[in-house]
């Protein structure tokens, strides 16, 4: 096979990248073309994303690829975080910055909607984990508040769909990102119009759902001219970053659980059909769309967000730590002294994460962590124990064997947390690839254009092209006692 080039745009809640993938003789090489910061913008008391700035950064990435690297990619694809969306008017113009999912306007939306549509019914109809920022609740909050923005909204597009639209001029909703909305019929490409209309959301604002691996069209003449590009297809990859990441799990057997570790930790299994029952509702599991007819049965766990936030607060206070330095502080601190529930709502978007952690520990009669090392150790111990808790829940509701955990994404670089996770769960850990989302994005493009044949073939290429690190459980610490303490303070 001659070298084939694909450009992935991978946007996260804190940064975005343009990554060039070179596929050559079943080996994949990655080159970072462009990197930029992303953060929520606080404007008039609400949090927004600056989609116009983000699109400019993506165009810069394409321009660099063409002009600085001298490469015309065969295609481009975009993935982002889930649930957030853009409003367009009837002329097809974006009429507002999109709200960010951590905005407080949805704080009461779940309970308010349950007065109209009972929680049990909503879960049975969608199979999606209840989180106050799901698109369903964001839209319902706007309907409930009689938002003037809704009155002039002709269509909505989720973040990757909106960026695809800006590139191609084509409005579609890709399956994996649409599934995060809590508004589709499980395992299908159909909107749940019964639920949508019960929530008062105008059904006509929703776009046709397409499967990942659909060619939307070519970049517009305007984009081509601005970036110096030739005609390039825009492919709707798995627009939800986690869905793209799971594609790159380097395992060809169906005996694994995964943790896609970044700002969020997404932990689950890949299955053919949704798991929807009263038990999965009570455990608050989600069934999101995957690639190749798969369902991502998983739970969203607050992940590196906790570390990112304490790091940010301490930097504002004049103490700047690198990630390795923070790990070393944790390593030197006493294990299991303080434990938190990472998913407690008080950690969603506090003004001071360090104080929020101290408050939780105080309220659960543990005392309070004083040193930075104690705070960091508390976070890492608690995440590892949360992974064990989630693993046991998955095993309770599914008979799918789990013999290994694959940790992918940026968190795969955290060898300290990986070892804690192996110790806590008693399972072998395989860490890598770290650029899982970009790899999945790229390989879906390659499959769409006929250069790769199947999901299994993709995963073999990833395994052959990646440096993987393995972690084996140790019994140096009493994790069973720690787990029992964790249950006492978090349940």
Positions of PLM-derived features:
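N-terminal glycine/serine-rich phosphate-binding loop of ATP-dependent small-molecule kinases
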Residues: 1-96, 124, 224-234, 425-427
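Active-site core segments that coordinate phosphate-bearing ligands/cofactors
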Residues: 2, 7-8, 20, 107, ...
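Short glycine/proline- and acidic residue-enriched helix-loop micro-motifs
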Residues: 44-48, 119-129, 205
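Short acidic-aromatic active-site loops that bind/stabilize oxyanions
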Residues: 47-55, 128, 132, 209-213, ...
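Short beta-strand-loop/turn "lid" adjacent to the catalytic site in phosphate-handling enzymes
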Residues: 63, 67-101, 129-133, 164-185, ...
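Short glycine-rich phosphate-binding loop at a beta-alpha junction
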Residues: 72-80, 155, 208, 400-409
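Glycine-rich beta-strand-to-loop/alpha-helix junction loops that act as flexible
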Residues: 79-83, 212-213, 261-264, 404-412
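A conserved helix-loop-beta module that forms one wall/lid of the active-site cleft
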Residues: 200-212
